[in-house]
């Protein structure tokens, strides 16, 4: 598909897409991707690369992503950069907002134009609006609820869209994990991509790990396999008894979307039993938040969230700073961390909690995404830390 064949090229006719905010504000632009409309929470992501990984991250369920970097789509799409494990699930992101038109892809790995890929995935897109102004609005007023709509005719039921945006309850109180979790148990042995070789296979695993899928990303599974794990991925509603019956050397609590307090209604009792069993446990993102809930802390909704691949985090135990990839709109309230739980990492942007460890137990978690994809690799060591804990437990 050439640029001139899609609405994203900003044709010389009336706008074909709208972003309707809950306060009644209407932003006009040009449509791309699927036609139709979707409601969600508008956030902004500051990453300059990795748009396909971001758009396929299940943690974005219920959200409309605004990219602050203006040139999105210029390297096309491919099959290797998809992060969703459950391809049958509803796409995570409800919509995407871009500043400029999508150019023809120019990359040796590209197999498809981003516009065609969005259509195939059922994701609605909008280009041609002032994304800097929208980002400034989010920074000052918080993440708004909104409807994104695309119609090639340029005709919209504006009253109905405004009403839908206004009445949508927002992400607080929503359990979105059922939309993205795997329906059945499966095993994973694919290891990280290597230049000129592609993805590898773990054919001599040292550890048996059960990964609870709240919306897990492929690169997390690859890095687990890369440190010697045979990974069994289980649905989010799997009981502690079923997990422990698999005799895991470790349990991984994955990333995912929605309000952790709502998902925690069924997940927290499971996590508490896993902690009591003494099994080494590692959590990321939503898994981190629910681990916090499991030890008695509380979570809270953030004003604008953290979404990007350049977030500095300080390791409070070493004083070192890591540049990390983040994607979350909720956080563990550090003021509620109980005795016996150590805060290990904090954000250097706002001081919010980014990591915890349980004293005297092989249990830890981080709020950010050490697997990156996209993002820096500063935090890959955490997967090795998990492997070391399992090795120590096995040799005890």
Features from the language model and the residues they span:
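Proline-centered loop/turn at the N-terminus of a beta-strand
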Residues: 124, 208, 280-282, 298, ...
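RNA-binding accessory domains that recognize and position tRNA/RNA substrates
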Residues: 2-246, 258, 373-378, 385-396
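Residue-level structural signal for beta-strand termini and adjacent loop
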Residues: 31-32, 70, 327, 358, ...
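Short solvent-exposed loop/turn micro-motifs enriched in small/polar/acidic residues
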Residues: 10-13, 306, 338-339, 348-349
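Cysteine-nucleophile active-site neighborhood
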Residues: 245-331, 375-393
């Amino acid at each position: 598909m050439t640029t001139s064949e899609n609405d994203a090229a900003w044709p010389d006719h009336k706008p074909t897409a709208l972003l309707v905010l809950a306060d009644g504000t209407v932003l006009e632009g040009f449509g791309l991707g699927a036609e139709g409309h979707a409601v969600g929470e508008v956030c902004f992501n500051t990453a300059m690369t990795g748009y396909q990984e971001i758009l396929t991250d299940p943690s974005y369920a219920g959200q409309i992503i605004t990219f602050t970097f203006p040139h999105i789509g210029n390297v096309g799409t491919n099959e290797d950069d998809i992060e969703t494990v459950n391809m049958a699930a509803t796409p995570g992101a409800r919509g995407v907002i871009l500043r400029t038109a999508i150019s023809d892809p120019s990359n040796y790995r590209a197999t498809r134009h981003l516009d065609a890929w969005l259509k195939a995935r059922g994701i609605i897109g909008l280009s041609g609006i002032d994304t800097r102004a929208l980002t400034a609005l989010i920074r000052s007023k918080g993440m708004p609820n909104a409807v994104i709509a695309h119609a090639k005719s340029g005709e919209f039921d504006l009253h109905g869209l405004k009403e839908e945006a206004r009445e949508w309850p927002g992400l607080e109180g929503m359990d979105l994990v059922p939309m993205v979790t795997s329906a059945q148990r499966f095993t994973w042995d694919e290891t990280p991509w290597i230049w000129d070789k592609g993805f590898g296979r773990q054919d001599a695993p040292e550890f048996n790990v059960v990964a609870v899928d709240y919306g897990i990303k492929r690169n997390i599974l690859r890095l687990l396999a890369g440190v010697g794990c045979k990974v069994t991925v289980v649905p989010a509603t799997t009981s502690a008894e079923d997990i422990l019956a698999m005799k895991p050397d470790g349990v991984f609590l994955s990333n995912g979307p929605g309000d952790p307090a709502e998902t925690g209604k069924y997940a927290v009792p499971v996590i508490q039993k896993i902690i009591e069993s003494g099994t080494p446990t590692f959590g990321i993102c939503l898994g981190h938040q629910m681990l916090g809930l499991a030890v008695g802390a509380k979570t809270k909704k953030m004003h604008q969230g953290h979404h990007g691949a350049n977030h500095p985090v300080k390791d409070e135990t070493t004083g070192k700073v890591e540049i990390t990839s983040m994607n979350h709109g909720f956080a563990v309230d550090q003021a509620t961390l109980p005795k016996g739980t150590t805060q290990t990492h904090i954000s250097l942007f706002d001081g919010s909690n980014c990591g915890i460890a349980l004293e005297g137990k092989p249990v830890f978690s981080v709020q950010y995404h050490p697997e990156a994809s996209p993002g820096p690799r500063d935090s890959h060591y955490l997967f090795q830390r998990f492997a070391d804990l399992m090795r120590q437990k096995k040799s005890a």
